[in-house]
Amino acid sequence: VLMMADGLGLELDELTVESEVELATEDISIAAGLVPQGTVAAQRWEWCGVAYGRDVIRLEAIYKVHKSVAPQWQSPAWVCTIEGSPRLHFEADKWTTNGLVGTAMRAFHAIPAVVNAPAGVRTFLDLPLIAGANVVQQ
């Protein structure tokens, strides 16, 4: 959220963070092993960047060990919604495959920019990416 605000040329008044967990109601066997009953089987996180008295950037992340856990939370997916003019909305329902491919593509295509960058720690904002600076209206 902080890097998105920076890329938008936006100074946040506040950053809020909320989280909650769901426990396994029974033993769950997954590829990585056993998730015992009573242990954390899902997490929901939400970060909100507040400016001009309203949430201007909101990021929600839901992690589940199995799709049957925490049915009240949205199923794992990649969803991006930009409320603006025009409004943009994108959903990728094959969250594991698309998420892994999306992450790998981002890293793969960054190689030339990272190689050509000065030595040191860099963020996506330091590399030649397009950012919509100064587009959040008061």
Labelled PLM ranges:
Residues 1-70, 76-78, 97:
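Active-site-lining helix/loop region of Rossmann-like oxidoreductase modules
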